Amino acid sequence: LGDVYKRQKSGIEKAETIAGRTNFIKTHGMTVIDDCYNANPVSMKSSIEVLSHAKGRTIAVLGDMGELGSDEKKLHHEVGEAVGENHIHTLFAAGELAKEYAAGAAEKSSDVDIHYFEDRETMTQELLSYVKEGDTILVKASHFMEFPKVVEALSE
């Protein structure tokens, strides 16, 4: 059994993560959770829960989710509620529907520091001046929002 355990341990240690799929990146004294390949309400809430277990200041950087149909506003609102319920310190939200994240978070907690932006570019510039060493930052949105550019900016 010892050899089997050693091989399994070695395999796990050598495993490489895929960009945009819950990839933990250590950069500039911060931890960035790159989960921006795609998003739906269930994966958003799960990622927010993961973020809530981090030490230090927690920052959810969320963009719109696509292809949700007529319930899109309600579903974005519920994700915002999860931000408040999970005691996330700060929400940076970008996109037309991301207003609902802000509304949902504010509804569930007055302690969330909420920053809403209409576009990713403006949000990214503000985020770069906001983050500091020790922060854990979740970056998540549907692929069309191009949030890998946010991860790149945080990593430079």
Residue ranges and their predicted role:
Residues 3-156:
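ATP-dependent carboxylate-amine ligase
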